């Protein structure tokens, strides 16, 4: 594989892998680690390298299905995939929305209702769901892969379907509706 398919230019993936399976302080010190980089999730130093996400899901699923049992124990070791990433969109201007069933216009209530994301210089970041990614995660779980997913770093409240904030949304100047408290792919709200 080209080095861009597994090189961590930002350091986040390496940091998380160290927590999970570092040789000195990791929780699973004897785990075997494989690094695969997702194309399109660039860190600040990344030259936009990596593999397409759909290919990665297929590779992990097939590898899990065909791997052999541990030679010492005779048991197939678990496959754990860490996905400490997520999808987001940016917005600059809000025209209105809905908070707990009450519609509003303008952007003054966004902050009051706790519906703003983290401003990163280019706009406010908002988590988004990607149905194809969520379906691929379901397939991994059904295949027996243990899936660990990021909770997020942007201080968004995540609500389940019975929470009064689950259907909160805002609309931006492009007419797009963004549900605020549903998390991002892969399944950060489940």
Tell me the role of every PLM-derived stretch.
Residues 1-55, 70-80, 89-93, 142-144:
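Subtilisin-like serine protease catalytic core
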Residues 11-13, 27, 49, 58-61, ...:
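Low-complexity, compositionally biased segments
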Residues 21-25, 58-66, 86, 138-145, ...:
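Sec-exported extracytoplasmic/periplasmic mature domains
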Residues 37-39, 55-59, 100-103, 168:
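Short, low-complexity, polar/charged sequence segments that are solvent-exposed and flexible
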Residues 50-72, 127-133, 187:
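A Trp-anchored, charged/polar loop motif used as the substrate-binding/catalytic surface
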Residues 87-190:
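Substrate-binding/specificity loop regions of serine endopeptidase catalytic domains
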């Amino acid at each position: 594989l080209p080095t861009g398919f597994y090189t961590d230019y930002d350091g986040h993936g390496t940091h998380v892998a160290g927590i999970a399976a570092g040789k000195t302080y990791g929780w699973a010190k004897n785990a075997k680690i494989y690094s695969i980089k997702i194309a399109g999730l660039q860190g600040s130093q990344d030259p936009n390298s990596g593999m397409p996400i759909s290919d990665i899901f297929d590779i992990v699923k097939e590898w899990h299905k065909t791997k052999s049992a541990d030679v010492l124990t005779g048991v197939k070791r678990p496959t754990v995939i860490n996905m400490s990433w997520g999808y987001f969109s940016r917005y600059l201007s809000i025209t209105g929305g809905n908070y707990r069933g009450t519609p509003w216009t303008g952007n003054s209530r966004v902050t009051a209702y706790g519906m703003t994301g983290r401003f990163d210089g280019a706009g406010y970041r908002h988590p988004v769901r990607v149905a194809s990614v969520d379906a691929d995660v379901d397939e991994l779980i059904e295949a027996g892969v243990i899936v660990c997913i990021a909770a997020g770093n942007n201080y968004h409240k995540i609500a389940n379907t019975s929470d009064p904030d689950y259907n909160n949304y805002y609309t931006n100047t492009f007419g797009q509706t963004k549900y605020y408290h549903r998390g991002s792919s892969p399944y950060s709200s489940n």
